[in-house]
């Protein structure tokens, strides 16, 4: 769910989730156009993963509760007993790890929406 995802981001990046709420064309609500950089691509992949969770698996990824561990910046999805919990946890885990690896460019925070056409 979105609260767990926020905490995963904090675990891997030590940044506030607000730093990612309006970044590039895909980080935050919705998304369109071409991702502006690697971090924005992470967000597009995460959006696509949530889309697959909804369409293919019938999940509600923004509300699906799951279990995970965070230790020294390492994320592990725990033994989630349903396909939705496991799938959504891995969507969020993959994105949080991707966020940690991708450079953060302040110039891509709150960018002009026409760049995302």
Curated annotation (Swiss-Prot):
Broad class of where this protein is predominantly found: secreted
* Keywords assigned by UniProt, alphabetized: Calcium, Disulfide bond, Glycoprotein, Hydrolase, Lipid degradation, Lipid metabolism, Metal-binding, Secreted
Q: What is this protein called?
A: Acidic phospholipase A2
Q: According to the UniProt entry, where is the signal peptide?
A: none
Cofactor notes:
Binds 1 Ca(2+) ion per subunit.
Entry-linked SUPFAM superfamilies:
Phospholipase A2, PLA2 (SSF48619)
Q: Which residues are glycosylated?
A: 80
Q: Which domain of life is it from?
A: Eukaryota
The tissues where this chain's protein is expressed are given as: Expressed by the venom gland.
Q: Where is the active site?
A: 46, 92
Main function: Snake venom phospholipase A2 (PLA2) that shows strong myotoxicity and induces edema in mice. Shows no cytotoxicity in vitro. Has a strong anticoagulant effect in vitro. PLA2 catalyzes the calcium-dependent hydrolysis of the 2-acyl groups in 3-sn-phosphoglycerides.
Q: Quick one: which residues bind Ca(2+)?
A: 26, 28, 30, 47
Any Gene Ontology CC annotation: extracellular region
Q: Which locations, inside or outside the cell, does it occupy?
A: Secreted
Among Pfam families, the record links this protein to: Phospholip_A2_1
Select a single GO molecular function from the record's annotations and give it. Answer: calcium ion binding
Q: Which PROSITE patterns match?
A: PA2_ASP, PA2_HIS
Record-linked PANTHER family: PHOSPHOLIPASE A2 A2-ACTITOXIN-UCS2A-LIKE, PHOSPHOLIPASE A2 FAMILY MEMBER
Disulfide-bonded cysteine pairs: these are: 11-70, 25-116, 27-43, 42-98, 49-91, 59-84, 77-89
């Amino acid at each position: 769910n979105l609260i767990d995802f926020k905490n995963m981001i904090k675990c891997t990046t030590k940044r506030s989730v607000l730093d990612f709420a309006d970044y590039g064309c895909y980080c935050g609500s919705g998304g369109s156009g071409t991702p502006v950089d690697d971090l924005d691509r992470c967000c597009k992949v995460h959006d696509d993963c949530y889309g697959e969770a909804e369409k293919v698996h019938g999940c509600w990824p923004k509300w699906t509760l799951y279990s995970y561990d965070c230790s020294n910046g390492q994320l592990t999805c725990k033994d989630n007993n349903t396909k939705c919990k496991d799938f959504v946890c891995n969507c969020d885990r993959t994105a949080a790890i991707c966020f940690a690896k991708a450079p953060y460019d302040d110039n891509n925070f709150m960018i002009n929406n026409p760049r995302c056409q």
